[in-house]
Regions:
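Cleavable N-terminal signal peptides of Sec/SRP-targeted secreted and luminal proteins
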Residues: 5-24
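CBM-like carbohydrate-recognition segments
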Residues: 25-75, 79-122, 130-133, 167-170, ...
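Long alpha-helical scaffolds in large eukaryotic adaptor/regulatory proteins
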Residues: 76, 83, 127, 134, ...
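An active-site-proximal structural segment forming one wall of the substrate-binding cleft
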Residues: 99-102, 136-151, 194-208, 264
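Asp-box/WD-like beta-propeller blade repeats and closely related beta-sheet repeat scaffolds
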Residues: 139-169
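Active-site cradle of extracellular carbohydrate-active enzymes
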Residues: 173-189, 193-250, 264, 268-272
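Membrane-interfacial loop- and helix-cap regions that link adjacent transmembrane helices
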Residues: 222-226, 232, 259, 278-291
Length: 446
């Protein structure tokens, strides 16, 4: 969020909380300890916004933006895994457990009435990541029950309930996120059912206006009102990132299939072309909203998520490593220079400016943390890649988790109007939540 109007007071509070920190992040990109220090600084700042570990508060809860909790916990998981710092692991464990809900499907009753498929998915990805990184299943099962064939020959709607603006849209983050989840479950469990679903979602996406395997354009959404004949082609980095990440997992699952290597390369190159523009020195930019300074909190998180997915892609598909790491490094150096706000390492949004730009918030700190941690792959290598159930993972799949969920909304509704879309705003950010539930959420009991 941009500071000058609504966040000045918040900025003052954050200043008081960690004003003793250094006024700048002096990042030496080739130095492992320097990267650790940078990540530690931004993680500390990020956690000043988290109150779920305080008396009377709900662990893992962000009442006005529930899905963003999954982004914070994903950042904490990666931070712990790549740096070895366990400072926040208790908050991480308790928060993930608390928000999983009574069915282990990340649809807690406090929020289930307004969740989107993408919201739930992001929490699932957090749980999946916990399993893959050996930290300590119901989302997948609930989501595939919502595979909708009433229009467009399949696909996931953006929203779950008919009264939600967005119910008649099918979008890339919901479908690409479920694809990613299925691919990761296939690799982790080696169970064919997940690979079958990954291929099904991928092929449907290719048959729709969302994903083009000739140009590798990824559109944001398509409308059921015209049977998905047209697209909303607003460009967001996380739409590319989620399909790329899923393709990388399928590449690993299939032991190097040429089909999936082509997909990874195509999506990665298009991502670089669109969001790492040479006019900005090849620094990561959310091009739809940053130039106009109109990014909302969701959109501020996209670059952090994609930075993480790029780092995992580099580990899963080794031929991409030498292309991905320089992009991450260049962006990290610039981002560190943006973390000079308010004399307390407050990070900005427009990293390409290489100076603080006046933005302040939890989301800015999460994205910077994700980027710094992503650069740790240079020093940790393949030894820190995601494990499977047979290579060190201790989570077990629960094929019936989430079966009690009844949120398969099939009530006919009228098409969404242009005004409805404007009110809905940008598609809700994160695609990763849904996967964790299906893993039986073994992080709960070890």
């Amino acid at each position: 969020m941009y500071l000058p109007v609504g966040r000045i007071v918040a900025g003052g509070l954050i200043f008081l909380l960690f004003a003793s920190r250094a006024a700048a992040i002096d990042l030496i990109i080739d130095d492992e300890q320097s990267l650790r220090d940078a990540a530690s600084t931004t993680t500390f700042a990020m956690m000043t916004y988290y109150h779920g570990n305080e008396t009377g508060q709900i662990p893992g809860a962000f009442p006005s933006k529930w899905w963003e909790g999954s982004a914070l916990f994903l950042a904490l998981l990666h931070y712990w895994h790549f740096t070895g710092d366990t400072t926040y692991n208790n908050e991480l464990r308790v928060g993930l457990e608390w928000q999983s809900g009574k069915n282990g499907d990340y649809m807690p009753s406090n929020y289930s009435s307004y969740l989107g498929n993408d919201d739930q998915m992001f929490w699932g990805l957090a749980a999946m990541t916990a399993a893959e990184l050996k930290f300590g299943d119901g989302v997948f099962n609930t989501q595939i029950k919502r595979w909708d064939t009433t229009a467009c020959n399949g696909g996931m709607r953006w929203q779950i309930w008919p009264y939600q603006s967005g119910y008649t849209l099918k979008n890339s983050i919901s479908n690409g996120g479920l694809f990613q989840l299925a691919a990761r479950l296939a690799r982790y469990t080696n169970e064919p059912i997940y690979a079958t679903w990954a291929n099904k979602i991928w092929n449907w996406s290719l048959s729709s206006p969302l994903l083009n395997s000739s140009t590798w354009n990824v559109a944001d959404s398509t409308n059921m009102g015209d049977n998905c004949a047209t697209q909303g082609n607003t460009q967001w980095s996380y739409n590319y990132g989620t399909y790329m990440m899923g393709a990388a997992y399928m590449y690993s699952y299939t032991n190097g299939s040429a089909q999936w290597l082509t997909a990874v390369d195509g999506l990665m190159n298009k991502l670089f072309e669109e969001f790492f523009p040479s006019s900005n020195g090849g620094i990561f930019e959310e091009v739809t909203c940053e130039p106009s300074e109109q990014c909302n909190n969701n959109e501020v998180l996209f670059k952090g998520l994609v930075s993480t997915w790029l780092s995992f892609t580099a580990l899963l598909v080794p031929s991409t490593y030498d292309k991905i790491l320089p992009k991450l490094q260049t962006s990290a150096v610039a981002a560190a220079k943006s973390c000079t706000g308010h004399n307390n390492n407050t990070c900005g949004v427009r990293w390409y400016q290489s100076q603080y730009d006046g933005w302040i918030g939890m989301e800015e700190q999460i994205s910077a943390t994700d980027l710094f941690v992503a650069n740790m792959i240079r020093f940790t290598g393949n030894s820190t890649g995601p494990v499977t159930a047979t290579t060190g993972g201790n989570s077990t799949s629960n094929p019936t988790a989430g079966e009690n969920d009844t949120s398969t909304a099939s009530i006919p509704v009228s098409a969404i109007t242009t005004g409805d879309r404007a009110g809905a705003g940008i598609l809700t950010v994160l695609f990763t939540a849904g996967w964790f539930g299906l893993m039986g959420f073994t992080v709960l009991g070890g």
